[in-house]
Amino acid sequence: MNSAVNESAIIRSVRETLARAERKEREIPRPAVTLSYAQSLDGCISANKGRPTAISGNQSILITHQLRAMHNAILVGINTVLVDDPSLTVRHVDGENPIPVVLDSQLRTPPHAKLLQQIEKQVIIATLPGASYERESKLVKAGARVIRIPEAGGGGILLTELFRWLREQNVNSLMIEGGAKVISSVLAESLGDQLVLTIAPKFFGRSGVRAVETLNCVRPTSRPCLTDVEYERIGDDMLVWGRLVLDNAVAADG
């Protein structure tokens, strides 16, 4: 891949939105959040549960690495780590690696995971207060920093508290790449500022893993939607960008 990448209109929109979101005063402090992932035409982020799936084309992958270079930190869920074993670094383009953050309520991250092999940025693993201290010790020896975050009401890690903690660590911008549970939670809790969605010309069918699961929205009569939407063809893929807002005009189901 060629590291000389021209900045697209969508990348410029992302940069401008990050700058505004970082300055925004919030009731609960958090970083500016960019939700970014790739899906098939039928809304799947994987062809089969538990198996890695190549979705984006080469040109779209370059965009993903540009986005990584624009953020202080990058977050994924434990299933993404176990299935894809990502490094979460910036490659193919110039830029600094973001701080890797993993949501791992049971500390299942393998000490030999690729993201723990990069020494430039220490990996942050967010877990629950009751997680195994023996597993924590192994991950700390592997180079990770383990932090314990309160549990959310419906289970899992309380994202608002994690994001507050990240902001206190001077993480001003956070890119979220998945997986499905993380994507759904960020949308349901209105914790994102913008979405960068890559749509590949593929179908995965019934066996595919949906990008968005049930949206248990904090405000039941509102749903997340995009505004100021932009579209751009990148190779055979379609890139969609927009600011994430709540559509307060949406009526309750039924």
PLM feature spans:
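Enzymes that bind and transform nitrogen-containing heteroaromatic metabolites
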Residues: M1-G254
